[in-house]
């Protein structure tokens, strides 16, 4: 019994010490919280105006006055043929790009035709295949969503009324440089062969013009790409210089003469066109032919 009593007395003593220790910890924690609350409630001195003016950055309101920022209120569309090249065609397109680089992108400082590198548009940076397109219109801006809906519906009606059937579109294998509408980007593209495709392409200009006119677009004639300018962009230039942008027509003349003289690209490129595409912002609507 004495041993049991000794054990119990020892246990009581340790419990007492534990309770006192816990009370002291709680008291310390309470004191710290009280100090923090007092510090938070204390008013800090005001920041001097000189410091505020030194580090203040005013908001850039001018960017909202730029034309591109105001375009967000429009409903966009875009009309084109889509081409999904096969792996064999990919190799031919890559050969065209490499030949262009070899001829016009030498690194000597004396070379007047030195350009920046071109990135292919038919392959992503991860190696996935990407579709190419033949632009039939420029970027279309509608004031209301209803206008865009009318345009796309009239495109359907026009294709049906004209009984458009699938056809093969022939592409020239000799590349040309094309400048973007904003004049800050160069594309390496392949022109659409004009003579063999004249009969198939001509009805689309009328169909698109009527659809734009019925949707309420006044300058619709300026938005349709002419048959002479139809092309497939296969590569894009990375940050070309202003001098290069100014002389891209001269580059085209020189390039055409050299490539035709060497006769490097004797093969023909063509693909089946069985539908037309109209974009709704980032969504593509496919309108198949009859």
UniProtKB/Swiss-Prot annotation:
Record-level GO cellular component terms: cytoplasm; mitochondrion; nucleus
Subcellular location: Nucleus; Mitochondrion
Stretches for region Disordered: 1-26
Tagged with keyword rRNA-binding: no
Mutagenesis / variant outcome for changing residue 133 to A: Cannot restore cell growth in USB1 depleted cells
Function according to Swiss-Prot or TrEMBL: 3'-5' RNA exonuclease that trims the 3' end of oligo(U) tracts of the pre-U6 small nuclear RNA (snRNA) molecule, leading to the formation of a U6 snRNA 3' end-terminated with a 2',3'-cyclic phosphate. In a second step acts as a cyclic phosphodiesterase that hydrolyzes a U6 snRNA 3' end-terminated with a 2',3'-cyclic phosphate to a U6 snRNA 3'-end-terminated with a 3' phosphate. Participates in the U6 snRNA 3' end processing that prevents U6 snRNA degradation. Could be involved in aerobic respiration.
Descriptive protein name: U6 snRNA phosphodiesterase 1
Phylogenetic placement of the source organism: Eukaryota, Fungi, Dikarya, Ascomycota, Saccharomycotina
């Amino acid at each position: 019994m004495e041993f049991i009593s000794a054990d119990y007395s020892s246990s009581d003593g340790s419990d007492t010490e534990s309770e006192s220790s816990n009370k002291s910890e709680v008291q310390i924690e309470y004191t710290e919280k009280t100090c923090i609350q007092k510090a938070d409630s204390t008013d800090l001195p005001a920041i001097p105006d000189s410091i505020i003016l030194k580090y203040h950055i005013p908001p850039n309101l001018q960017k909202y006055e730029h034309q591109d920022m105001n375009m967000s209120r429009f409903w966009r569309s875009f009309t084109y043929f889509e081409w999904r090249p096969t792996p064999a065609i990919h190799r031919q397109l890559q050969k065209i790009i490499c030949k262009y680089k070899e001829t016009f992108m030498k690194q000597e400082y004396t070379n007047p035709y030195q350009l920046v590198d071109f990135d292919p548009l038919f392959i992503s940076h991860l190696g996935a295949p990407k579709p190419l397109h033949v632009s039939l219109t420029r970027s279309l801006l509608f004031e209301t969503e209803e206008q865009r809906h009318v345009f796309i519906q009239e495109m359907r009606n026009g294709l049906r009324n004209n009984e458009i059937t699938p056809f093969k579109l022939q592409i020239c294998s000799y590349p040309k440089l094309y400048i973007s509408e904003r004049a800050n980007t160069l594309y390496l593209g392949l022109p659409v062969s004009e003579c063999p495709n004249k009969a198939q392409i001509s009805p689309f200009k009328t169909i698109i013009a009527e659809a734009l006119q019925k949707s309420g677009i006044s300058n619709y004639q300026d938005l349709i790409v002419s048959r002479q300018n139809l092309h497939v962009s296969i590569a894009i230039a990375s940050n070309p210089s202003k001098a290069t942008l100014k002389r891209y027509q001269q580059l085209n003349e020189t390039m055409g003469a050299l490539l035709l003289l060497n006769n490097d690209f004797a093969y023909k490129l063509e693909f089946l066109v069985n539908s037309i595409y109209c974009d709704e912002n980032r969504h593509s609507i496919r309108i198949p032919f009859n």
